């Protein structure tokens, strides 16, 4: 037993620590954890909506739609918060402007994931005519797309900063204004990239990732021994990286 522990400490632990400390994985972990307060509060309202007491549904019927709102604007659009949080953490590791990086990531994610719906004729009391943004694509179903958009956006921003392809303002300009103009070229590149991919080429990053992961989901969702073993392995693997696997 002591020999096994020695091997784990000397060979396995350093490799695992190196993986867990990888810049992008650390940003993903910390970015997701940063929205934990919103997740917890939003989940409480789900409990309030589903209390298993006879007659409870009738009791809350007048305010049921209102009770659902906090969940919809926390967990229901969690991909927006995650993209901002991951970009913020990754930018911090690169000594980039965190706030600007977060905004760029959110813009990139929204452009790459959401296609506005055009309602030409509204229905009174139901929906008004105009362009609507479906929030279903902003939930956990687009989480992988949000992660990818955040990483790509920050890496593009870093590339422009390192190559000094930025608009430089005079010394007397406030830092907030200077940082905003410095991010102008990266913003153009990020927005154009995701716009071309999603709206000109019609390529949905989130859907593509879901399709690629579909075989894995099939194995994990099945009742086979392989599915059970793989599920446990992935849970433990994410724990090693500092990410709560079941969550």
What are these regions (language model features)?
Residues 2-47, 54-244:
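Signature of multi-pass transmembrane helix bundles
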């Amino acid at each position: 037993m002591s020999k096994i522990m020695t091997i784990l400490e000397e060979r396995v632990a350093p490799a695992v620590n190196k993986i867990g400390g990888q810049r992008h994985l650390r940003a993903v972990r910390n970015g997701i954890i940063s929205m934990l307060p919103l997740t917890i509060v939003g989940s409480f309202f789900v409990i309030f909506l589903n209390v298993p007491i006879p007659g409870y549904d009738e009791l809350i019927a007048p305010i049921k739609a209102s009770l659902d709102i906090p969940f919809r604007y926390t967990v229901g659009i969690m991909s927006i918060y995650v993209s901002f949080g991951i970009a913020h953490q990754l930018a911090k590791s690169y000594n980039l402007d965190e706030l600007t990086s977060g905004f760029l990531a959110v813009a990139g994610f929204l452009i790459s994931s959401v296609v506005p719906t055009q309602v030409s004729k509204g229905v009174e009391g139901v929906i008004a005519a105009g362009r609507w943004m479906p929030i279903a694509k902003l939930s956990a179903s687009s989480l992988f797309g949000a992660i990818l958009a955040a990483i790509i956006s920050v890496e593009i921003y870093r590339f422009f900063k390192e190559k000094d392809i930025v608009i430089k303002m005079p010394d007397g300009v406030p830092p907030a204004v200077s940082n905003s103009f410095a991010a102008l070229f990266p913003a153009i590149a990020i927005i154009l990239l995701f716009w071309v991919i999603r709206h000109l080429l019609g390529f949905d990053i989130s859907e593509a990732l879901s399709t690629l992961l579909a075989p894995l989901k099939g194995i994990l969702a099945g009742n086979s021994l392989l599915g059970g073993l793989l599920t446990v392995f992935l849970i433990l693997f994410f724990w090693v990286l500092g990410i709560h696997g079941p969550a």
